[in-house]
Amino acid sequence: MAARAQIKLLPEMFQSNGCASLEDTKSTVSKVQTRTERFQERVRKHIDENYSEFMTNHTSPDIFLEESSSLGREINDLLETVGTEGLAALNGSSTQLADHSRELRELMLGLQVSEHILKIDELFQCVEEAKGTKDYLVVLDLVGRLRSLIYGEGEAATQDVVRIFQALECYETIKVKYHVQAHLLQQNMQERFDRLVQLNCKSFPNSKCVTLLVSKEEGQLHDIVIALFQERYNPVRLCEFLLENCIEPLILKPVGVECNENAEAGTYVQLSLSYSTKESGTASGTSTQLRPNYKQVLEHFRLLLQTLSGINHSLSSSQHVFSIIGDHVKDRMMHLLVNDCLIPAVPETMEEYQASTLCEDVAHFEQYLADSFLINPEVDRGLSQFIEQYGTYYRNRLCSRVLESTREIIQRDLQDMVLVAPNNQAMDVTGCDPFLFPRCMVSRSAQDFMKLMERILRQPTEKPGEDEADPLAGVIGMMLQTYIDEVPKVHKKLLESIPQQSVLFHNNCMYFTHWVAQNANKGIESFPALVKTLQATGTMHFRVQVTYQTSILMDIMESFEFESPHTLGTGPLKLVRQCLRQLELLKNVWQNVLPDNVYNSTFVELLHAFINELVRHIFTQRDISATMASDLSDLIDVVLEKAPKLFRDPHEVHQVRSWMKLQQLKTMMNASLKEITELWCKGAGPLTANYKADEIRYLIRALFQDTDRRAKAITQIM
């Protein structure tokens, strides 16, 4: 029943599509097949002539495309005649008709392949026509469509059509022709671009001249730039030229810039750059070269970008020509701009800092670069970070400048000195006002050093915010610490060998200590520690010199010897006079340099050491004759006469602890046994202030012969 129903259904289907019977359908299919095969043969011949034999062929692919469309419609009509249900009926009644249906589908696929090739051929001809009119955007579009058809990109054809097409013999030839056309297009566009945008560089022995010419024909420039950059253009050569010959020199060198907006009879905008290529003669390279002013650099940059603005067209919603160029140059450009132009332009003084518009200028320039699409400010934050760190850069520059000045002052001779506080006498300092600095000499360099510190304190600083560091914080401490650390190194030999040098360094440190204390309320950081360090450093080097001078006296006195047990001889007197001369020399270099109280206390110490050594040597003599006692008395007289003259006020000599001891020793050299015992007065006399009983007994034994009277006197020394 089902089979009879299907057979009954078939005539109705064929009649509705213009076929009276199955035989008519077979005949129609056969005719279409024959026509299609003939058509494909003609298409094959056309393709062979164009892509295999490369013969001249004036046949337009349009004729083939129209015929292909007509055949396609007929085949589609036949396929509709034998639909899904009809095909099932045919399968049940006639395998032959089903085969014809499949043949129709294969014919249709072959026809589609032919049509695909014809479309490619038509596009090749359109490319040639568009090239004649130099309409590069049209050519670019046609070449893009060619690529889609040849490589099966997008929805240009079904996968079956592309698969069969790419398996044909003509495919490789078509592909080669496409690549030739694409290369010629790229070459022609590059040549045209090079005529519209001319980049020239002339090198001379010590200089270079760079010229940029950009056409004012906006329409042509727009089309060629859009076409060139959309066709996978590699801008490396352009970017390298701009970076090497324009951007880097503008940042690193003084550049002569000339702009002519009506060059070449008004058809081009011209920018000329000229600069020296002579290398610096020092190893430090660019650091010693004359740097251009940052304002000049930014202005020249604007001129460069304005000159090239004619090529800065939009390629897409998110990309411009400058953004492509920026991808190649911005890292190097930003690095040089920040490190070699902007950071060196940061002010070094507070006056310059307050007058500077550097941050505002950089912010405006960054916005200009962003508006030109050369950078993306959200990603390329080099200039923003410079602005954020501007305070730190300023502080570093200020400290570097101050440190440089500090080191220059430290190198100066300490011996070049100047009087300070000339009216502050010792009695005024110790009595009236202990905060006065005493009259003394300091190095002229120390005075210059103090002036530098005062200048820093006078800087008109604004109160920093909560998150903003005071740019001057710690600068004074850094300067003084550098002075403390560096002076002993720089002047090491002189500090060790020349007495006046160490004294001046001591005075300098005390001078700075007094200044720091006076300015403690002005925000000097680590004030107590600085005062202690300055005092300790100055005192230490001074004490080293005092110890050295004491050792000189001790070395002289080490040769102190009596000529014989009975006579003193001339040697001891010479040694004593030599010590006094040494002290006299020291007085000449110290008295007018040190503050009076320091000088007095120092000479009190030196005299005490000298007198003690003299007394010690006298007490080593076990037998002192009357003649020798007289000579010793005269020798002591020399000391008693000369020592007071070492002080401005001779009475200062009484501050020497061993002074009275020496005077009493002279008295005992000339005294009788009775007088000595009376001076002792059973331990209550004046001798007890400076001598012990053992020392007096020893001296009595040395001065007097062994008698009952001497023995009795010795028993009284208790």
Swiss-Prot record:
It is found in: Cytoplasm; Nucleus; Chromosome, Centromere, Kinetochore. Pfam families: ZW10_C (PF20666), ZW10_C2 (PF22766), Zw10_middle (PF20665), Zw10_N (PF06248). GO terms for biological process: cell division; endoplasmic reticulum to Golgi vesicle-mediated transport; meiotic cell cycle; mitotic spindle assembly checkpoint signaling. The keyword Cell division applies. Its main location: cytoplasm. It comes from the Eukaryota. Keywords: Cell cycle, Cell division, Centromere, Chromosome, Cytoplasm, Kinetochore, Meiosis, Mitosis, Nucleus. InterPro entries: Zw10/DSL1_C_sf, ZW10_C, ZW10_C_2, Zw10_middle, Zw10_N. GO terms for cellular component: cytoplasm; nucleus; RZZ complex. PANTHER family: CENTROMERE/KINETOCHORE PROTEIN ZW10 (PTHR12205), CENTROMERE_KINETOCHORE PROTEIN ZW10 HOMOLOG (PTHR12205:SF0). Belongs to the ZW10 family. Required for accurate chromosome segregation. This is Centromere/kinetochore protein zw10. The lineage of its organism: Eukaryota, Metazoa, Ecdysozoa, Arthropoda, Hexapoda.
